[in-house]
Amino acid sequence: MRNRYIEHFEKAQLEQKSVPEFKAGDTVRVAVEIKEGDKTRIQNFEGVCIAIRGEGTGKTFTVRKIGANNIGVERIFPLYSDSIKDIKVVRRGRVRRSKLYYLRERKGKAARIKELR
C-alpha cells in the first residue's frame, strides 16, 4: 500500500508535464538538456523505443539507435525528468511485443520494424 501523500504529490507532478502517447516499437526523438560547466545545450537522441517500464513518476523508457560503425547505443530515460525538454514521435511501429530486447542481436535489415498503417 502506497502512502496517500506520495500518491497526491505524484498526481500533481504528472499533471504538470505533458508527454506524448507512444509505445514500444515507435521511433522517438528525445531532446535532452545537457549541462557542461556553466553552459547548457540540447542534444537530440533518436531511435526505437524498445521498452517502457514502471509507473507514475518513476516510469522509464529505453531507446535504442545504431550509432557510428554499426554499434548499438541504448539510453534509459526517466519519462518525467526535468532534463527531457521534448519527446517527439517520428513514426509508429507495428510490433507484437512490449519488450523488444531481441533487437539487440539483430543487425541491418533484420533489425527494422514495420510501420503502422
UniProtKB/Swiss-Prot annotation:
Which portions of this protein are annotated as coiled-coil regions?
none
One term of GO molecular function: structural constituent of ribosome
Which is an annotated Pfam family here? Ribosomal_L19
Tell me which Gene Ontology terms the entry assigns under biological process. Answer: translation
Q: What are the GO cellular component annotations?
A: cytosolic large ribosomal subunit
Superkingdom of source? Bacteria
Q: Which UniProt keywords apply?
A: Ribonucleoprotein, Ribosomal protein
Q: Which family does it belong to?
A: Belongs to the bacterial ribosomal protein bL19 family.
Role noted for this protein: This protein is located at the 30S-50S ribosomal subunit interface and may play a role in the structure and function of the aminoacyl-tRNA binding site.
Cross-referenced PANTHER family: LARGE RIBOSOMAL SUBUNIT PROTEIN BL19M, RIBOSOMAL PROTEIN L19
Q: What is this protein called?
A: Large ribosomal subunit protein bL19
State which gene encodes it: rplS
